[in-house]
């Protein structure tokens, strides 16, 4: 499904509130044929939803931070546990939290505007961009758990939270081919993978921050292709500016679409799961653009976590990363994504790193 008119690669348009399509419009999309024409029509009809970043400034902005600063990344897996997630993030003392997989008005996460709720509890501002307009209740288990309910808004996307002022928030669309529209991947969605970027001044130096989620139903070559798009977009967004990218890059070293389609789970050795660099060409792409990752990440530690329902089962892999350019990095940490009782609140751990502008890179 690839005939949709392309959305702009980068959009810096902002709004104080993203308006979700009404329930009737979303229901009509489910009733319409799942064709490229229907997908293109949906993108065109709801274009503003995908081209704008919703921005809420901090209630009491802190001064721009001095160096070094701590930055967090976390795939919050729908953010179904807002209170526990806010407590976890609040204990990190991060200048910014790069987040993906946040719901707005989804039954599975209590219909909450999760980025706004997190920001309120943290005393932070929030930038939020839509990755998908969700036409259903979620995956198979979520559809079972929430049968009979409806989504008030059906939005799902990425956010950057910070108690400091963020400049030039921008949504970067990594693809808009409609791979999730027909339901073959288990969910009906309009949209495609994104990155959310913004600029934070660190010790007076404008620094790009980006929260990223690469496609899960893909293979190493597909992930490398999305990485090329991302890095080209970041270069266009702020040429030569120091940058820190945090994301769920799904570096599982295999074609997950094939694995899920066949129901077969390849047997991979633990060393490969925890050090996917030789098997994922996106690392070579990053290196070619001047990014480094060794000082930014804890080696040999998985970033996946098994949920209370037993998924994903071990062995767990290292699929979430920080990548830095023009920054020195130190003190990386992988923080368990659990509540006060030790119960998993996401299937991804939290990543933290300390960064500072690198004078040698200027």
Which sequence ranges carry the predicted segments?
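A short, charged/proline- and glycine-enriched loop
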Residues: 64-69
